[in-house]
Structure formats: structure tokens, C-alpha cells
């Protein structure tokens, strides 16, 4: 674990390699070649990447770093959906209970993926 902490002061950027026609919602993710191409542009200017979710994109990012030796630290994100309704939320905070329960289950899987990838 000491290899990962502390992150200290780093030049960091939020990274999402999605191109036109790609979307995490549609489950269409950047290829390893596209990610590596991005990393060649980012290396030297950035030390750390912040990712948004523990999905296929995240897995590919970590694989490209390991396989091709890019020198990036990764701040892993977890994409969590609403588990409670919030009627005061301006962008739609009311959800049926079955949706909230589905979100709770998916959130649990997302956290488990984050722990496994960390």
C-alpha cells in the first residue's frame, strides 16, 4: 500500500477518453489504442489522472498504464446513483423506490469494483 500513498502534490487532470459515438451509458468505451494515444499527449504535462467510474474504461486505462509503462498515478472514482429521493434537487431528485433499490445494488457493485481495482 505504501507504493500508492501519499499521492502528495501532483499535476492532475480529470480524464475521460470518450470520443464521438462513445458513451458509458451506451457501454461504448474507448479502445486501448485510443487511450494510449491520449496518454502520449498527456505524459510529461500531467502526473495523475482522475477517473470517474470503475467501468470498462477504467479497466482499460489501468491496463494501458501497466502494459505500456506510462508514469501516471490514478485517482479512482466511483460513479454512484441516487439511493434516496430529494424533491429539492433542481435536476430531478424524485425516483420510484424500485429505481432507488436498483441504484443501491449497482452502487454496492461499483464500490466493490473500486476496492478490487485499488
Model-derived features with residue positions:
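Hydrophobic faces of well-ordered beta-strands that scaffold small-molecule active sites
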Residues: 9-15, 47-51, 72-78
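Boundary/entry segment of secreted carbohydrate-active catalytic domains
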Residues: 1-37, 41
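Substrate-binding cleft of extracellular glycoside hydrolase catalytic domains
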Residues: 63-118
